[in-house]
A protein has these predicted regions:
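Short aromatic-enriched loop/helix-cap "lid" or pocket-rim segments at secondary-structure transitions
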Residues: 32, 82-84, 247-248
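Outer-membrane beta-barrel translocator/channel fold
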Residues: 1, 223, 233-245, 265-269
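Outer-membrane beta-barrel domain signature, especially the mid-to-C-terminal portions
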Residues: 197, 207-214, 244-267, 295
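Short, glycine/charged-enriched secondary-structure capping and boundary segments
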Residues: 34, 150-151, 198-199, 249-252
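Predominantly the C-terminal beta-signal and adjacent terminal strand-loop region
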Residues: 40-47, 251
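Membrane-embedded beta-barrel scaffold of Gram-negative outer-membrane proteins
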Residues: 235-239, 266-295
Length: 295
């Protein structure tokens, strides 16, 4: 693993601007499958990765009281799963000959996975005055999943793509000299999935989804915090939350996790209520407490 970073601070055009690059290489012997009783002896997963990232921060961007934070990360990941031995192994290292390979239980395979990933994060906050501010947040996560096999000529190469856009808008209030704070927020979760793989559709669910589809899901909520005095403060919140599946859950990891392409986002209704404060026991001794309840 190696990493290099360079940048500048306190410039007229940027409070902070950094560029970094890193490379890594991992050679991993696989010990078990999805269950501990499924023992591997010669299966391997080798990975080479490279990353370039940029981050930028600027207060009073273009206009006064507009703060901007942005970052970009691009990763190139190439993994190779080696499954070329017709053996069945046991925990003591012994084995017997088998009619199929260790991982897939089929013919010999030297499967390649190229998974480029792009992550963009940006945040802009504008303060109207000491009591009101508006915040806009955007996150892009794009993961590719190109697969091909050097040895299994029956395998059809595929190129899947998962793209997630999350756009959030929040309005913040502060009253009573900062003792009462409210936040109202709205989020749009956009999920785009393009799938070419059809192997093991009875496991992956690839036959149950369209080859290319885009879905949008809304989240929203409100939160408030009231400080009565330093020892006594109360906070409460409600959120209709959404969790989009990550790339590993949808597309698998190429060895121990099968793809689950038909997996849908999770949603929940969350209520939180809490009591917290800071009690001064002596001039140099303070006790902070917090009690929370949620459903």
């Amino acid at each position: 693993f190696g990493q290099l970073e360079a940048g500048v601070t306190d410039k007229s055009w940027a409070d902070e601007f950094f560029v970094s690059a890193s490379v890594s290489k991992i050679d991993k012997e696989l010990q078990t499958g999805s269950v501990q009783s499924w023992v591997y002896g010669m299966a391997e997963r080798n990975t080479e990765s490279a990353n370039v990232s940029v981050r930028y921060n600027k207060a009073d961007f273009l206009v006064k009281d507009l703060d901007v934070h942005a970052s970009l990360s691009q990763t190139w990941d190439h993994s190779q799963t080696v499954d070329t031995v017709f053996r069945k192994y046991y925990w003591d290292g012994s084995y017997i000959k088998n009619a199929s390979s260790e991982i897939r239980g089929r013919g010999k395979s030297l499967r390649h996975y190229k998974r480029p990933m792009t992550i963009v994060r940006s945040n802009a906050e504008y303060r109207f005055n000491d009591k009101h501010s508006l915040n806009l947040n955007y996150v892009l996560n794009r993961a590719g999943n190109k697969q091909y096999d050097e040895m299994d000529k029956t395998y059809v190469p595929t190129n899947d793509v998962l793209v997630k856009h999350i756009v959030g808008l929040s309005y913040n209030q502060s009253f009573l000299d900062g003792k009462l704070n409210n936040v109202f927020f709205l989020k749009d979760y956009i999920n785009h999935l393009k799938v070419e793989q059809t192997e093991l559709s009875f496991i992956t669910g690839s036959d149950a989804v369209k080859p290319s589809n885009t879905q949008s899901y809304w989240g929203y909520g409100v939160g408030t915090r009231l400080t009565v005095s330093e020892p006594w403060a109360i906070k409460a919140s409600y959120e209709h939350s959404v969790r989009l599946p990550i790339a590993r859950e949808l597309l698998g990891n190429g060895s121990t996790i099968y793809p689950n392409i038909a997996l849908r986002p999770e949603s929940s209704e969350n209520f939180n209520l809490g009591l917290f404060g800071n009690i001064t026991l002596a001039p140099s001794h303070h006790l902070y407490y917090e009690v929370n309840g949620f459903i």
